[in-house]
């Protein structure tokens, strides 16, 4: 780390200007000064009366290592000689009221294992990376026109040892990576790994933003994990929470006895949703802390993306009973994204946002927030409500399955089947499905078929791939014993085949962010709850026809309008017996009938299985074939894609 002596920094630079490598000033850095080895400790505490560095090295004596105030705005610093790596320490802060409080270092890169709360001196440098090829290849790809399948997981509950102990970062590399590779996920998304005191906050209520949690090992161990992911072609996305933080006494809350990192105004300071406090995003020092933190994770841990948590909670605050936009947060998010993309244009910045705020994924120079992806929470909520409805009543809420296509290309979307939907009494995805045992599995296969063929990149929370019956239990690992049961094994096989089909089928992702990539065949068959549509790639022959049946009825010789190719093959049927279905499949090549149907030039007659999805691929095109309206077979639109920056 390029340690900068705080006395060399312009007096007001950190307080008034964009300073995105503030981690080089603040924190505890192993250095040699005047020929003596030790640690330089620097911290910002604007309302402290006095400060000391304390730890085992001085028996936690507040009087021994007094810090010097080097700026009027509250930067304090001290060189502590003769202490080395792995020394524990805190800051003893005398408040304006005369009390002395102990605080962990906001910029510490390592911390004690909970329940202990001290910071730990650690040299973040020294890890030898082996991922140059990965980084080079990633930066050459356009993330918008590639397949993206994200496996969301909680590090502490994906799998545990027989005695219930947690796997370390290095052990997880051995356990998790082969599993992810087998399933052909392109990325993993890990719930927050910043240091946090309470296991059941899942990392979303942090105290040490620069410290990879010591529950699983050292920062270098996490670097090894990321390096191994890159070795096997897996991108790593981290959940990151720049909106709020916890109130634990050793953390950022009332850091110098007064609101420092949080808003001073209690009306906007308190985050009533989670019992936390909101970052004061209008304060330059706080912005520098957070944006430096994002760039720190990029630089030192080589991560490939952030999922920015609770953006909706940042964009709006409830002040005096009225919902108002938070202009501090809006400008912060724009500044954050500009800083990130200045470092890496192909980095993933995903907003978890449930609002209708416009232009979330538009560049800031076009008036947008500057993210390149947004979770499609509306799609998730509508689809899951539809699936939870009894099949015979789905015809009355038919629009929940079609509404998302009205706005599907207004942003660059990721479709999330995330952890939030399988916890706190919401049931697992499998158990959300109505009906008996067979019905549940059939409908989950159907849901996944619709999920992988709908425009948007894909995200699935751990356990969904094999049909976890119980909802997520964060203190236990997944129910791996379910593989002893045939239907779960069949579900797992189906999911792996579906994701493999998705990755090798350009129509399912090449034009995700363009209206040209999707066309309804029939969106209006609410009586039978059958939906059919076309997914289109760049080339005319890159087209797939998808038919989804959301009831248990079976239909023979069902007419489906199709582009005029000579034949179609069914390349996937969720009702196949090998996946646990009833076997109502279309084994033979389907010859098109040159009679217009569904505003297409031709049609095929197929068997539609119960609770089934059927995917058809054209085999051969007729010369000069056209649709009924006289246009070329290939699906096209004059609307410009927003999948660009």
Curated annotation (Swiss-Prot):
The keyword Glycosyltransferase is assigned to this record: yes
Key words of the record: Carbohydrate metabolism, Glycogen biosynthesis, Glycogen metabolism, Glycosyltransferase, Transferase
Listed Polar residues bias regions: 636-645
EC number: 2.4.1.18
Annotated active site: 309, 352
InterPro entries, per database record: A-amylase/branching_C, Branching_enzy, GlgB, GlgB_N_E_set_prok, Glyco_hydro_13_cat_dom, Glyco_hydro_13_N, Glyco_hydro_b, Glycoside_hydrolase_SF
Reaction(s) catalysed (UniProt annotation): Transfers a segment of a (1->4)-alpha-D-glucan chain to a primary hydroxy group in a similar glucan chain
Biological or metabolic pathway of the protein: Glycan biosynthesis; glycogen biosynthesis
A single Gene Ontology CC term: cytosol
Keyword Cell division: no
GO molecular function, one term: hydrolase activity, hydrolyzing O-glycosyl compounds
GO BP of this protein: glycogen biosynthetic process
Residues covered by region (Disordered): 619-645
Oligomeric form and interacting partners: Monomer.
Function summary: Catalyzes the formation of the alpha-1,6-glucosidic linkages in glycogen by scission of a 1,4-alpha-linked oligosaccharide from growing alpha-1,4-glucan chains and the subsequent attachment of the oligosaccharide to the alpha-1,6 position.
Similarity remark: Belongs to the glycosyl hydrolase 13 family. GlgB subfamily.
Name the record gives this protein: 1,4-alpha-glucan branching enzyme GlgB
Top-level taxonomy: Bacteria, Bacillati, Bacillota, Bacilli, Bacillales
Gene this chain is encoded by: glgB
């Amino acid at each position: 780390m390029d340690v900068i002596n705080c006395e060399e920094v312009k007096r007001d630079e950190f307080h008034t200007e964009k300073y995105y490598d503030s981690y080089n000033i603040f924190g505890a850095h192993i250095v040699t000064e005047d020929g003596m080895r030790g640690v330089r400790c620097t911290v910002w505490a604007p309302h402290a009366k006095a400060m000391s560095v304390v730890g085992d090295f001085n028996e936690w004596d507040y009087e021994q290592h007094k810090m010097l105030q080097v700026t009027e705005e509250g930067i304090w610093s001290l060189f502590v000689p003769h202490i080395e790596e792995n020394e524990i320490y805190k800051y003893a802060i005398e408040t304006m009221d005369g009390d002395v409080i102990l605080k962990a270092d906001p910029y510490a890169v390592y911390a004690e294992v909970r329940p202990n709360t001290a910071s730990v001196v650690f040299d973040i440098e020294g890890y030898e990376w082996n991922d140059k090829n990965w980084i080079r290849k990633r930066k050459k790809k356009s993330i918008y026109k590639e397949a993206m399948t994200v496996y969301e997981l909680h590090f502490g509950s994906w799998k545990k040892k027989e005695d219930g102990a947690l796997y370390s970062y290095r052990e997880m590399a051995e356990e998790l990576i082969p599993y992810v590779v087998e399933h052909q996920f392109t990325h993993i998304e890990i719930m927050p790994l910043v240091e946090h005191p309470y296991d059941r906050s899942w990392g979303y209520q942090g105290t040490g933003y620069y410290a990879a949690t010591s529950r699983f090992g050292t920062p270098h161990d996490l670097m090894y994990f990321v390096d191994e992911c890159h070795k096997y072609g897996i991108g790593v996305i981290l959940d990151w929470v720049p909106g709020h933080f916890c109130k634990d006494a050793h953390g950022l809350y009332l850091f110098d006895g007064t609101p420092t990192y949080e808003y001073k105004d209690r009306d906007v300071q308190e985050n009533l949703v989670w019992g936390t406090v909101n970052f004061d995003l209008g304060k330059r020092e706080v912005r520098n802390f957070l944006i430096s933190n994002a760039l720190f994770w990029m630089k030192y841990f080589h991560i490939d993306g952030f999922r920015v948590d609770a953006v909706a909670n940042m964009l709006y605050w409830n002040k005096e009973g009225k919902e108002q936009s938070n202009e501090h947060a809006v400008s912060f998010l724009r500044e954050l994204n500009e800083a990130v993309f200045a470092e890496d244009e192909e980095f993933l910045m995903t907003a978890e946002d449930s609002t209708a705020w416009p232009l979330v994924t538009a560049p800031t120079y076009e008036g947008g927030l500057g993210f390149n992806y947004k979770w499609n929470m509306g799609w998730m909520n509508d689809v899951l409500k539809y699936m939870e409805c009894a099949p015979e009543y789905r015809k009355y809420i038919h629009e929940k399955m079609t509404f998302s296509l009205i706005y599907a290309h207004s942003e660059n979307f990721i479709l999330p089947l995330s952890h939030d939907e399988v916890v706190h009494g919401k049931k697992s995805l499998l158990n959300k499905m109505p009906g008996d045992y067979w019905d549940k599995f059939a409908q989950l296969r159907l849901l996944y078929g619709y999920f992988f063929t709908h425009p948007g990149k894909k995200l699935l929370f751990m356990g969904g791939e094999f049909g976890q019956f119980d909802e997520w239990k964060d203190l236990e690992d997944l129910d791996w014993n379910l593989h002893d049961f045939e239907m779960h094994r069949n579900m797992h096989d189906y999911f792996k085949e579906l994701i493999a089909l998705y990755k090798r089928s350009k129509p399912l992702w090449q034009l995700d962010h363009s209206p040209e990539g999707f066309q309804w065949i029939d969106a209006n068959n609410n009586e039978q709850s059958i939906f059919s549509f076309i997914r289109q790639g760049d080339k005319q022959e890159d087209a797939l026809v998808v038919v989804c049946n959301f009831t248990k009825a079976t239909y023979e010789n069902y007419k489906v309008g199709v582009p005029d190719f000579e034949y179609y093959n069914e390349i996937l049927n969720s009702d196949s017996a090998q996946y646990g279905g009833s076997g109502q499949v279309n084994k033979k090549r389907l010859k098109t009938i040159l009679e217009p149907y569904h505003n297409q030039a031709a049609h095929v007659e197929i068997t539609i299985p119960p609770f089934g999805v059927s995917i058809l691929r054209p085999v051969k095109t007729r010369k000069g074939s056209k649709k009924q309206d006289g246009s070329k077979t290939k699906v096209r639109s004059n609307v410009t894609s927003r999948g660009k920056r």
